[in-house]
């Protein structure tokens, strides 16, 4: 059965894989794993998550601060990672479309056009500030990492 988190759905086969990994780390068969096992569990899923992100997610699903999470909490964390990875793929696809010269960078004027089209009613000054914060070297171009940080507010 698929599992839905906000607007993201974890497919049935992904839930099964997650369940298998969860069981491996549920050493006592208590239907819970230690929050310290999240990192190794994600590595077992061939996923990389920064330790501070794992801690943040663990804190969100370990409501009573026991240091343990159940399978539902694990699935929520897994879903967040899958969503994060999908968002990055989508941004890479968008970046490739905007990278007209296929040089791994987009012109800040193209970025300005994108920001105007986001529908956030940004002023020219706000857009200028965002571009200045993104194009830190003043080259007039933005690479994918800079684009990603801007679009995800990281």
Curated annotation (Swiss-Prot):
Residues noted as binding Ca(2+) 3 in the record, renumbered to the chain: 135, 137, 139, 146
Source superkingdom: Eukaryota
GO cellular component, one term: membrane
Keywords: Calcium, Membrane, Metal-binding, Repeat
SUPFAM superfamilies named in the record: EF-hand
Listed GO MF terms: calcium ion binding
Residues that bind Ca(2+) 2: 99, 101, 105, 110
Family matches, as SMART domains: EFh (SM00054)
All copies of domain EF-hand, residue ranges: 13-48, 49-84, 86-121, 122-154
Protein location: Tegument membrane
CDD domains (alphabetical): EFh
InterPro entries in the cross-refs: CALM/Myosin/TropC-like, EF-hand-dom_pair, EF_Hand_1_Ca_BS, EF_hand_dom
Residues given in the record as Ca(2+) 1 binding sites: 62, 64, 66
Job of this protein: Calcium-binding protein.
Protein name: 20 kDa calcium-binding protein
Natural source organism: Schistosoma mansoni (Blood fluke)
């Amino acid at each position: 059965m698929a599992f839905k988190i906000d607007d993201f759905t974890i497919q049935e086969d992904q839930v099964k894989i997650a369940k298998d990994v969860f069981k491996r780390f549920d050493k006592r068969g208590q239907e819970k794993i230690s929050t310290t096992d999240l990192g190794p569990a994600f590595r077992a899923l061939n996923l990389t998550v920064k330790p501070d992100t794992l801690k943040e997610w663990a804190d969100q699903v370990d409501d009573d601060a026991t240091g343990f999470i159940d399978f539902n909490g694990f699935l929520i964390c897994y879903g967040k990672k899958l969503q994060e990875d999908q968002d990055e793929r989508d941004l890479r696809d968008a970046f490739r479309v905007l990278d007209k010269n296929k040089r791994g960078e987009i012109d800040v004027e193209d970025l300005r056009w994108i920001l105007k089209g986001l529908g956030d009613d940004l002023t020219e000054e706000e857009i200028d500030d965002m571009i200045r914060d993104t194009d830190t070297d003043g080259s007039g171009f933005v690479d994918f990492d800079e684009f990603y940080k801007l679009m995800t507010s990281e």
